[in-house]
């Protein structure tokens, strides 16, 4: 399997080296910007709030995926190489598939409402996974991925839509927040060593809760465009 990945990696490198791409002229908003731009952004409270929100989201994603197999093995006796691995695969699969459902929901509802609903759904699944029986836990863990799938794009869009300038620099700051994916799983493990893995994974209540709050305090400059279903129904009737 690793040889297959290595082959395709080398193939992609070769294609990129042989391809000719047009030269892109970045606008002022798209450029990374000067040190002064970053200082200006660092003085904005909303920038830090979204930075920690992105930190929390990536922590949720990796913190869940990294410990699913161990939890199912430790508390329910599932084989980590079969059932555990399958649960992790389903988590990532639903995390991907849920993006398509998110596209539909964002055409109907305000992005903040979608984020609130997804956060509550993820918290419910987390509770079922941590405290439910084996038959529920093995399903609830992957289901977290379905609800988490819409969080990344919504948080990113709300963040960039909350500042009027320096979007390129702000994007760089948000990208730095992916360090949460490296730190949160370690925190879960450290807490788990002291009070048990269930207690460690309970840290995800804090990170998912952080995402939930965005739906209440976010104030985007422009709201996402949604379909007016009542108007569409009236027009169809006439």
For the regions a language model picked out, list residue spans one by one.
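Helix-to-loop junctions at the C-terminal end of transmembrane segments
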Residues: 97-110, 192-193
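A membrane-interface helix-boundary motif in multi-pass transporters
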Residues: 1-6, 187-208
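Short hydrophobic/small-residue motifs within alpha-helical transmembrane segments
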Residues: 54, 91-97, 178-180
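C-terminal membrane-cytosol helix-exit motif in multi-pass small-molecule transporters
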Residues: 3-28, 212-219
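Extracytoplasmic gate region of multi-pass secondary transporters
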Residues: 41-90
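Juxtamembrane intracellular "pre-TM" segments in multi-pass secondary transporters
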Residues: 24-50
């Amino acid at each position: 399997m690793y040889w297959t990945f290595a082959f395709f990696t080398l193939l992609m490198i070769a294609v990129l080296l042989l391809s000719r791409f047009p030269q892109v002229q970045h606008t002022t908003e798209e450029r990374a910007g000067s040190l002064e731009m970053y200082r200006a952004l660092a003085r904005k409270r909303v920038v830090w709030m979204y930075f920690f929100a992105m930190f929390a989201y990536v922590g949720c994603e990796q913190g869940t995926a990294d410990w699913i197999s161990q939890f199912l093995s430790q508390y329910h006796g599932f084989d980590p190489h079969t059932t555990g691995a399958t649960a992790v695969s389903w988590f990532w699969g639903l995390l991907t598939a849920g993006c398509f459902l998110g596209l539909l929901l964002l055409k109907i509802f305000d992005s903040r409402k979608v984020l609130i609903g997804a956060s509550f759904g993820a918290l419910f699944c987390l509770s079922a996974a941590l405290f439910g029986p084996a038959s529920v836990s093995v399903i609830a863990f992957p289901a977290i991925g379905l609800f988490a799938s819409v969080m990344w794009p919504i948080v990113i869009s709300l963040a960039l839509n909350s500042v009027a300038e320096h979007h390129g620099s702000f994007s760089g700051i948000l990208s730095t927040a992916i360090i949460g994916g490296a730190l949160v799983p370690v925190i879960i493990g450290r807490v788990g060593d002291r009070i048990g893995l269930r207690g460690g994974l309970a840290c995800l209540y804090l990170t998912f809760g952080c995402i939930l709050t965005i739906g209440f305090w976010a104030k985007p400059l422009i709201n996402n465009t949604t379909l007016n279903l009542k108007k569409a129904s009236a027009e169809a009737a006439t």
